[in-house]
Amino acid sequence: MIFHGEQLENHDKPVHEVLLERFKVHQEKDPDNVAFVTAENEDDSLGFQQLGKKVLQISEWFVENGYKKGDVFLLASYNNWRCFAAALGAWRAGLIVSAAASQFTSFEMNYQIEDSQSQVILVDKHTLPVVQEACKNLKFVKQIISISANPPSPVIKFDVLTSRLVRNLKMPLIDPKNDIVFLPYSSGTTGKPKGVMISHLNFSMMLESSLRFFDANAKAIGLPPDFVLPYDLHFLPMYHAMGMFRTLLTSYRGTTQIMFTKFDMELMLKNIEKYSIMVLSLVPAIAVRMLNSPLLQKYDVSSLVSVTVGSAPFPESASKKLKQLLPNVNIVQGYGMTELTFATHLQSPGSPDGSVGRLVPGTSMKVKKEDGTLCGPHEIGELWIKGPQMMKGYWKKEQQTNELLDEHGFMRTGDIVYFDKNGETFICDRIKELIKVNAKQVAPAELESVILEHDDVADVCVFGVDDASSGERPVACVVSKRGRDMETSKAIMKHINQKLARYKHIKEIEFVSEIMRTGTGKLLRRAMKKAFLDAKKAKL
């Protein structure tokens, strides 16, 4: 069985043109319409009119300084509206924008700069030393630009790019279907990070698909047609495809984005109260922290009508807790990956608990068994996706790109799922993360969901380790809200062992101070397993 979402028409405009046209519309409706406000410093704000002008100025700086179509511009800064303005300017000048995690070490930064061949890099005061160290002996790097004041020479200030007259210079011709607009790097959970080539068409079609979906959902929860949120909180990092796309989508709608340089729980809750935030987007790690935070009772969050949780699996038990805490809020989950731009599935009001929803417009899916035959409803298999949001491929890795595709152009996701008769899809686990216990497959995510139901558990990571009698056995690393004693360990084991089949039973619990995750909240399961095994060896 193959499911198809609502059809979409192809767009023939570069994404920056689409956005610049919308900025003019926002400006005409309200010349004082604000695009961005910095959460930590509200005096640092930018209107849509100013944003449009800065994009033109920045694009002309790139052209005047000899940068060509296809050159790579790297964002290596914590979130800031200047990053978005610079990205739009670079796109208009024909450049590819890549983005690196602001928490990177110089080793990690060097890998991405060298792999992407980034010629110009945007930094802030926090990332500048790391980038400078990473760029040693990289002669192809031509310029570092800092959004912070008074950078050391030869680093130049961001203001240099925007303190110029617009001369209406000729810009390169863009082919939306084939030209790359964004080059984020995959998380590297299956090896070294790979550059993911996202085209102008990928972004434009994802915009159209998301707008249709969200408009339909707004109507379903009682909001008027074409309703525009007055404010939105933005703390998802722009180095991630989801973070960058949400910035595009929200600015397209004309919503004022309160942009966080770094995430801060109390500042988030304070701003929900201050701006009467209606819709909130979280990664699972932040959602779990919010569930366990006493600060939630300190602020009025009654304005919330919807909370979207994405970028990594969100356990059903955590979702239920969130609904108990915020009973009047619609919890929306979805499914996507960097290679799929933003999302392929999103929940609608009425979606069953535990699902990631149905296909967004323009998308098709099938689920394959191990023998290659197609699954029917409630049969478990691997999810394959086809749609206009599919990446062009991996940067300089044609063979690895081809290995992802089948003869019909569907892309394998590596995720184990099942669906019901309505196309509601349920994620079970990653293929490579399944634990084999006496030849039976155990999904870590299932065990994590049950463990999180226990009142003493704040966070958890489950993985498999070698076992002489069963092949592998599941181990849980747990962040406890209370004790780390044997009694707590036994209570957690009893909880899970009462609920699940014997072969899924946890045999060992290791208490830890934190669970390692990527910046977007994905569990670093392999890193947690390595740390566990290293600690075991050290005790021998």
Curated annotation (Swiss-Prot):
It catalyses: nonanoate + ATP + CoA = nonanoyl-CoA + AMP + diphosphate; IC-asc-C7 + ATP + CoA = IC-asc-C7-CoA + AMP + diphosphate; IC-asc-C9 + ATP + CoA = IC-asc-C9-CoA + AMP + diphosphate. GO terms for molecular function: ATP binding; CoA-ligase activity; ligase activity; medium-chain fatty acid-CoA ligase activity. GO terms for biological process: ascaroside biosynthetic process; fatty acid biosynthetic process. PROSITE patterns: AMP_BINDING. A motif (Microbody targeting signal) lies at residues 538-540. It comes from the Eukaryota. The keyword ATP-binding applies. InterPro entries: AMP-bd_C, AMP-bd_C_sf, AMP-binding_CS, AMP-dep_synth/lig_dom, ANL_N_sf. Keywords: ATP-binding, Fatty acid biosynthesis, Fatty acid metabolism, Ligase, Lipid biosynthesis, Lipid metabolism, Nucleotide-binding, Peroxisome. Pfam families: AMP-binding, AMP-binding_C. Its EC number is 6.2.1.-. It is found in: Peroxisome. SUPFAM superfamilies: Acetyl-CoA synthetase-like. Expressed in intestine. One of its GO terms (cellular component) is peroxisome. The keyword Ligase applies. ATP binds at S186, S187, G188, T189, T190, G191, K192, P193, K194, D415, R430, K522. Belongs to the ATP-dependent AMP-binding enzyme family. Plays a role in ascaroside pheromones biosynthesis, which regulates development and behavior. Specifically, activates the side chain of medium-chain indol-3-carbonyl (IC)-ascarosides for shortening through beta-oxidation. Converts IC-asc-C7 and IC-asc-C9 into IC-asc-C7-CoA and IC-asc-C9-CoA, respectively. May play a role in fatty-acid metabolism by activating and converting nonanoate (C9) into nonanoyl-CoA (C9-CoA). This is Acyl-CoA synthetase 7.
